[in-house]
């Protein structure tokens, strides 16, 4: 994988690489201006373009949408997504099915899946994660990323603070269940998260250097997952809550809130659950070691204050989640993935109904 930032000459490495090739460029109504710009730049250097355009205001990666791109890319040597989450996942899926490389021109610092081996797609109304090619190229124009709506940057930051709980969940699984931890992947994600959080004041001001730190953390999530061969470094209980809610939005045919916004609130919920165990001194195998780690975690209130400064919602009701859906999420989100997290532990301890009123009062 090669990460290239735009300089005065554009993306010279990428443009030279694509000269005389045929590239399927996937974009939608929101990313059309950036797609047309890079299409013109590539065509001027001898690249043939197969445009794959979606007019959807809110693109959902359903089977028919992916099939359209697959058919349009029949003669392509390469697939380039111009967008963020959905378009990137769809391009990776098409790339894998066609067995050709892919890349992405990132249009927002909104999510952490740019470089992951997983593609989140909708199949029969359910969210599934397919194993796919990782992008060969990630193109970043900080002017484009900074011009994205602030709520998208807030979503990206929400995805990164989710690394507090997913890494803690990994430690929990190691202590309680003996699950192996890939130290390199863990450390890479932990360091990138720290650098991003340390740049928080600059993020609030939308400064280029801080946005670059956020993008680096988002990209590191993908590379750390690739290193260890699974999504543990980037996805835990906070993501399972998000996935559960996302499937409910799809079933109801409603607009899906940005992934990172759901993850951000899920992070607050998970941290609240961790601190509840410690504050109530609830015993379980390995509890002493887990409690020592909880002491090092930021409080939910600290992260909540940061999210509010970023303009991020801090209650699920602000995202249009129904109260009964959140109640169901607290009971069932641990089943979304076969992965041990704080949600699993709370379920095993029989504490879900006991703690639900507190969580609902704070985060609904």
Regions found by a protein language model. Give the residues of each.
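C-terminal charged capping/lid subdomain of soluble metabolic enzymes
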Residues: 160, 276-364
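A short, small-residue-rich loop immediately preceding and capping a beta-strand
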Residues: 73-94, 98-108
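Generic secondary-structure signature for well-ordered alpha-helical cores
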Residues: 44, 74, 137-150, 158-170, ...
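Gly/Ser/Thr-rich loops at beta-strand to alpha-helix junctions
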Residues: 7, 28-35, 84-88, 110, ...
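Active-site segments that bind and position negatively charged phosphate/pyrophosphate groups
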Residues: 186-306
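A glycine/threonine-rich phosphate-anchoring loop and its flanking beta-alpha core
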Residues: 96-195
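ATP/NTP phosphate-donor binding region
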Residues: 1-78
């Amino acid at each position: 994988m090669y990460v290239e930032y735009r300089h005065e000459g554009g993306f010279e490495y990428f443009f030279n690489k694509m000269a005389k090739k045929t590239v399927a460029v996937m974009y939608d109504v929101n990313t059309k201006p950036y797609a047309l710009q890079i299409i013109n730049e590539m065509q001027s250097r001898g690249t043939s373009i197969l445009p794959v355009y979606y007019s959807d205001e809110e693109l959902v990666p359903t089977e028919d949408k992916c099939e359209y791109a697959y058919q349009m890319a029949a003669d392509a040597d390469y697939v380039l997504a111009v967008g963020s989450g959905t378009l990137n996942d769809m391009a990776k899926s098409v790339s894998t099915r066609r067995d050709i490389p892919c890349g992405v021109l990132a249009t927002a610092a909104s999510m952490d899946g740019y470089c992951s081996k997983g593609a989140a797609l909708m199949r029969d109304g359910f969210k599934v994660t397919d194993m796919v090619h990782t992008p060969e190229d990630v193109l970043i124009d900080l002017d484009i990323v900074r011009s994205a709506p602030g709520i998208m940057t807030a979503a990206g930051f929400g995805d990164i603070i989710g690394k507090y709980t997913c890494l803690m969940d990994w430690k929990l699984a190691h202590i309680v269940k003996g699950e192996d931890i890939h130290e390199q992947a863990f450390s890479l994600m932990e360091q990138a998260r720290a650098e991003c959080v340390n740049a928080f004041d600059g993020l609030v001001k939308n400064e280029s250097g801080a946005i670059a730190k956020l993008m680096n953390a988002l990209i590191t999530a993908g590379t750390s997952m690739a290193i260890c061969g699974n999504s543990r470094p980037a996805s835990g209980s906070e993501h399972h809550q998000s996935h559960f809610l996302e499937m409910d939005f799809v079933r109801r045919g409603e607009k899906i809130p940005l992934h990172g916004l759901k993850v951000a609130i899920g992070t607050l919920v998970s941290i609240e659950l961790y601190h509840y165990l410690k504050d109530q001194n609830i015993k379980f195998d390995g509890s002493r070691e887990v409690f020592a780690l909880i002491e090092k975690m930021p409080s939910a209130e600290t992260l909540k204050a940061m999210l509010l400064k970023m303009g991020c919602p801090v209650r699920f009701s602000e995202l249009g989640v129904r109260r009964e859906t959140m109640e169901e999420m607290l009971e069932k989100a641990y089943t979304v993935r076969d992965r041990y997290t704080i949600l699993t532990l709370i379920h095993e301890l029989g504490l879900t109904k006991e703690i639900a009123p507190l969580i609902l009062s704070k985060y609904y």
